[in-house]
Amino acid sequence: MKMIIGRKLGMTRVFVGDKVVPVTVIKAGPCFVVQKKTIETDGYNAVQLGFEEAKKVNKPMEGVFKKAGVNPLKVLKEFRVEDPDKFEVGQEIKVDIFSEGDKIDITGWSKGRGFAGAMKRWGFRGGPKSHGAKFHRELGSVGQHSEPARIFKGKKMPGQYGNERVTILNSEIVKIDVENNLIAVKGGVPGARGGLVLIKSAKRG
């Protein structure tokens, strides 16, 4: 499986033949393999990648990077793989592992919108806007009184909105700029500009 870590730069458009295609530009890599995990030692197979050089790290992490033979890195993310032996600790992973036309799964973190009410968070209709109503943007009924005398788990209520992990499946790579470590992906990608994204080859592609 191919995978890399990147940052969303923003959206633009490119011409493919006679069509205009909206794309999201991602600065992907270079990443380094910091650690390998196997079923024998950890109970599962995975590879840990590091991205972006860090100015300062604590002593334990300094030892981890020294053991891997790489400079201290800011972002560490783990990817499940079937065969970790295909990777070497300290190996550099660049954007050239992908090709134009490849299908990929992209994971990002949606924009955080803070504490939001039910109308904004869930699209509730709200109450009447006039004629003596005092029920404008309220939630409405959340359950019964005496039985079960509690609110069921999962009830749509006000709370933290956004800042959730979101994965877009089967996105298509439209263009790759190997020199500048850039990928142009068809359509939108979750998160704000500068947000972290995890890219891996499509599972269902």
Curated annotation (Swiss-Prot):
Domain of life: Bacteria
Database matches in SUPFAM superfamilies: Translation proteins
Protein's GO biological process: translation
Presence of keyword rRNA-binding: yes
Bridged cysteine pairs (disulfide): none
InterPro entries with a match to the protein in the record: Ribosomal_uL3, Ribosomal_uL3_bac/org-type, Ribosomal_uL3_CS, Transl_B-barrel_sf
UniProt xrefs under Gene3D superfamilies: 3.30.160.810, Translation factors
Gene Ontology annotations for the cellular component aspect, listed alphabetically: cytosolic large ribosomal subunit
UniProt keywords, alphabetically: Ribonucleoprotein, Ribosomal protein, RNA-binding, rRNA-binding
GO function terms (MF aspect): rRNA binding; structural constituent of ribosome
Assembly with partners or alone: Part of the 50S ribosomal subunit. Forms a cluster with proteins L14 and L19.
Family affiliation: Belongs to the universal ribosomal protein uL3 family.
NCBIfam families on file: L3_bact
Chain's role: One of the primary rRNA binding proteins, it binds directly near the 3'-end of the 23S rRNA, where it nucleates assembly of the 50S subunit.
Name of the protein described by the UniProt record: Large ribosomal subunit protein uL3
Origin species: Thermosipho melanesiensis (strain DSM 12029 / CIP 104789 / BI429)
Record lineage: Bacteria, Thermotogati, Thermotogota, Thermotogae, Thermotogales
